[in-house]
Amino acid sequence: MRQPRLFRLRGPAPLRGARDRGASAVEFAGILPLLLLVAMAAIQLGLVGYAVQQAGTGARAAARTASHQETEGLYAARGRAAMSDWTGRRARFALSAGGEEVRVTTTVTIPSVIPGLGSLGEASRSATMPRD
C-alpha cells in the first residue's frame, strides 16, 4: 500500500526577488529630484529669513548714525558696514527725517538659489531713532 505524500518533492525553489535586483536604485533615482527640490526650498527659505534679519540690522545701524547731527550723512555707509558683505551690496537705504525723529528704511534684494531666476523680491525693514 502506498503512503500518501505529505510533501511534494520538487527541485530547488526559485529564488524570490531575483528580478527585483536594482529596484531600490531605481526608486532612489526617482525620489532624488524631489529630495533636491525640498532641500533647495529649505535653503531658499533660510536666505529669505537672513535677508530680512540683515535688513533690520542695517536699518537700525543707519538710523542710529543718522540721529547724530555730525554723522548724519554717513548713515548708508554705516548701515552697510553693519550688514554682511553680500547683503550690504544688495541694500538700499532711504532716510526720512522728521522734527525729533529719524527714520531709515533698508531694502535688500532677496537672491534666488536657482541660477538664472534673478531675485525673489525684496525685504524691507525700518528703524526710527530720536535725534540727538
Residue map of PLM features:
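Short, conserved structural patches
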Residues: 2-9, 68, 72-132
